[in-house]
Amino acid sequence: MNQSYFNLLGNITWLWMNSPLHKEWSCELLARNVIPAIENEQYMLLIDDGIPVAYCSWADLNLENEVKYIKDISSLTLEEWQSGDRRWIIDWVAPFGHSQLLYKKMCQKYPDMIVRSIRFQPNQKSVGKISYFKGGKLDKKTAKKRFDTYQEELATALKNEFNFIKK
């Protein structure tokens, strides 16, 4: 670890502290979510005039780790962050109104990707919603086909994991 690593960690921590949602989360969760992103270079940090304004991180999961993540968002190990090709946004922090710019930059960097996230509202931290996003160059028909495939695979895996009984 060097000075730039700690500067990066400090910038991201500062953004977390300024986010209404993230500032309530523990240091342990910050470490679990941020350190693997830095070590695997799976993040984007936007800086404006020397000040961090937005950050996101992602993990590329296999189906097994995707199910594990949905069951417990703090469960991923460092190695699991790069276990497959099913991209999940782990953190999205833009406390100063730069969310749209971050979205645009991610679409430019990954124009052909399908990305999912579990979104939480500050007043409902125990209930998350899975959201889907597509890269800027991915046409709607192809994106929908991929969305549907991912959804079907995930639903089947979750059904098998929880042993749901069909009535």
Curated annotation (Swiss-Prot):
Domain of life: Bacteria
Keyword annotations: Acyltransferase, Cytolysis, Cytoplasm, Hemolysis, Transferase
One GO BP annotation of this record: killing of cells of another organism
Catalytic activity: a fatty acyl-[ACP] + L-lysyl-[protein] = N(6)-(fatty acyl)-L-lysyl-[protein] + holo-[ACP] + H(+)
GO molecular function: acyltransferase activity
Chief location of this protein within or outside the cell: cytoplasm
Residues forming the catalytic site: 22, 91
Broad class of enzyme this protein falls into: transferase
Record-listed E.C. numbers: 2.3.1.-
GO CC terms: cytoplasm
InterPro entries for this protein: RTX_toxin-activating_protC_bac
Pfam families on file: HlyC
Subcellular location: Cytoplasm
Similarity section: Belongs to the RTX toxin acyltransferase family.
Stated role: Involved in fatty acylation of the protoxin (LktA) at two internal lysine residues, thereby converting it to the active toxin.
Name of the protein in question: Leukotoxin-activating lysine-acyltransferase LktC serotype A11
Biological classification of the source: Bacteria, Pseudomonadati, Pseudomonadota, Gammaproteobacteria, Pasteurellales
Gene designation per UniProt: lktC
